[in-house]
Amino acid sequence: MRQLCLSSALLFLLVILVDSTPLNIHHIQDEGVETSHRRGPEKRSVIDVVTSIIDGVATGTKIVKNGAGLLTGLAEIITKAIKGQVMISRIQFDNHTQEELPTLNIEYSTLSEENKGVETSHRKGPEKRSVIDVVTSIIDGVATGTKIVTKGASILTGLAEIINKAIRGQVMISRIQFNNHTLEEFPKLNIEYSTLSEDNTGVETSRRRGPEKRSVIDVVTSIIDGVATGTKIVKKGTSILTGLAEIINKAIKGQVMISGIQFNNHTLEEYQTLKIEYSALNEENKAASKPALCLEPKVTGGCNAVMTRYFYNAQNGLCEQFVYDGCEGNGNNFEKLEDCMKTCSQEAGSL
């Protein structure tokens, strides 16, 4: 059950990202996920990959018979993709093994074949609605600016439950009655939806200047924009998105201060630890999102020439001068300081 909740939460956040914040994504420098093709390595953005999955599989997924498991399977595939364990849309992640490829390809094809739309039932007769359209309408109408006070932390939990019911066709939302919904459930669910709507007044936060309110989506978007966009998944980098998910969960529960926002049920004792945790993710993300050559060690060579060159020191984030003797070496070798900074660290200074 916990795994299902996490999968649902992941899909929930991804839909927010894809459908609610496209303009915030494109202007950010996006180094991407390093992948492996027959033509050689390439980089793909985490967001691009996830978007392609959602566009190709989730949009209009038909939820009938065993179809309720489709989005669960999709969430699992996305999780595998984030961990670099799956090939999707001809993209093979760098730590993916050939042995897994056929199975995952079949799994993806099965999901694609069942992508026929959500069958719903209206007074005017049956119609089909996209899962994303339905979920987006819920998020737009309820989640944006959900107020997290007293028992308000359960609002997003309740929202997730409603989304799960909608996916399984057990709830009527925004005048859409799903095909296996019963009239007996209608009034109760309508009240549940109204209760959530009434609490939609923003996240109450506490700053030095006094309390303020911030939208849940604004907070989550700022985290995703700052950490997840284009995160390169190498070595320990896979833990970045896991840590990000944990931070988002803490934020939803009001247990974390992020981007200058302190939630109202956050304690001062937790503040410093969580701030360090967020900073560590940002630093790890900076290193992980650089071209591979920037992470290569300094190599002076083995000949007798004397040339002034520059390399990027991943330990301190600076472009540093060194003496190169003219042979051997690697890609982390620049003739000009400007080239080093432009390639590896636009914010770096020099020594």
UniProtKB/Swiss-Prot annotation:
A GO MF term: serine-type endopeptidase inhibitor activity
SUPFAM superfamilies: BPTI-like
A cellular component term, taken from the record's GO annotations: extracellular space
Matching Pfam families: Kunitz_BPTI
Classification via InterPro entries: Kunitz_BPTI (IPR002223), Kunitz_BPTI_sf (IPR036880), Prtase_inh_Kunz-CS (IPR020901), TFPI/VKTCI-like (IPR050098)
Keywords: Disulfide bond, Glycoprotein, Repeat, Secreted, Signal
Domain BPTI/Kunitz inhibitor: 294-344
Sequence repeat segments: 32-116, 117-201, 202-286
Signal peptide range: 1-20
Glycosylation sites: N265
Top-rank lineage group of the source organism: Eukaryota
Predominant localisation class: secreted
Location in or out of the cell: Secreted
SMART domains (UniProt xref): KU (SM00131)
Disulfide bonds: C294-C344, C303-C327, C319-C340
Annotated site residue numbers, Reactive bond homolog: N304, A305
Region (3 X 84 AA approximate tandem repeats): 32-286
Function per UniProt: May play a role in mediating maternal-conceptus interactions in the immediate preimplantation period. Does not seem to have proteinase inhibitory activity.
Annotated protein name in UniProt: Trophoblast Kunitz domain protein 1
Native source organism of the sequence: Bos taurus
